[in-house]
């Protein structure tokens, strides 16, 4: 299949789609990992939300073992947009594949009775 130029760059197309989403849905949520892609998406969505005076749900699923700098960045984003987000910081026990041990193929983040790597923030669900 041949390429068909659309006459629009990726950034402008993304902004149009975000605006369309705000036009067509009463509630908007963004899943946020703290990585570069979801950070760019969050900034773009929040630009539109602030322009329209709307709040956005921001979901972060905390797997307990993320790097401190990632957790710090996520908190900074929640703080930056505090007036415009409904924060959903989820820190619940979730069974995960354990790629660092052949003896324990599963690891449960935030497991009951386990010593946690760090404490979840007070706002965590």
Question: PLM ranges: what are they?
Answer:
Residues 1-125:
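ATP-dependent adenylation/nucleotidyltransferase module used to activate substrates
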